[in-house]
């Protein structure tokens, strides 16, 4: 059975590093425009290329969010954003607006499309409709139960389920509270989270009647995997890198070992909590116990000592990509080093000729030790084959240079996965038909002030 993907949020490049080094299989991130989390740092064109290359080198996928509602006068800007994502060689776009999906397909037909949770897909019929439209993956609404998810798994399309992170009081994509109160629309990436403010119910002041605890169904990853869910998604592009690391580690432990260690559970609760977590939607037992706020004890638990400990856990490269080295050195010939990751093969020949040793000849073990010095890279040499003549001399600097050169070229080869065909000349056109509007109605609309709408 294929392992469920661990999908991590990344609001910054630091979060990308934290996710990858903590064991994520994929990350999702936003461009500067058209992201449903505009408050996150997000990524410009060059940062997106850098992040995607880093992830691909480590065997991690990248999904870019263009999941807001788009206005007609933004379509040229949208076109540039889609082309930028395709040029960066990302693995998929996460979209809400069907117009965005259509334009993306016109510009880069082979670029996979994922249906955002902002589409509010919560039934098998909705999943089926998107599958028939050509979407590769559907991100289900957070509010679904186990039975509802199981029903959706009957459709032959990848499903993505939120397993940890914030819950909205309203279904994603359907909330207009922030837009109505402060003209900051969640469907434009600017939700002010007014549901976290104090609200009274039946004149009982002092409560937070709309604030839900964070969702956490990490403990059910085995069930989700057995159902056929493709991806376990962590919410939190506006959270710190330490949060990303802790959440990813919890998911990886649960998936790979069937439990989460006490240490990781403590980290997960400590980095962010609203008086604990809830699994109420998933198990089908909703109620008042789902509500919670960020208390003083929650804030105190998230101290700098905890964050420092988490940072230290991902400060170094993890060497998660297995490679093999083949080194050959014959007397009177140029040494040759070949590296392979099982898909890509890179060969480098030294500029100097191997000479007969005068004092101490090099041996196979010395060559092996030099080639295994890959600590600052993504690579882990699992097999090092040495084929050298006796009584020869090779400066260690030559071996080091060959190692660096082949790994640099391997980085370049691994960073490009898709190399999409992009239709840059595609022109965006608008229908010329304008629905008839009565003059009296047009006048009324023109004279109405925006403030009167609230």
Positions of predicted regions on the chain:
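Surface-exposed amphipathic alpha-helical tracts and adjacent flexible/coil segments at the periphery
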Residues: 1-22, 26-37, 49-52, 58-86, ...
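Conserved non-cysteine loop/helix-boundary elements of the Radical SAM core domain that shape
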Residues: 38-42
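Glycine-rich, highly charged phosphate/nucleotide-binding loops
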Residues: 43-48
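Alpha-helix capping/helix-boundary segments
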Residues: 99-100
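RNase H-like DDE/DDD metal-dependent nuclease/strand-transfer catalytic core used by mobile genetic elements
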Residues: 104
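Short, glycine/polar-rich helix-capping loops at beta-to-alpha or helix-loop-helix junctions
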Residues: 122-126
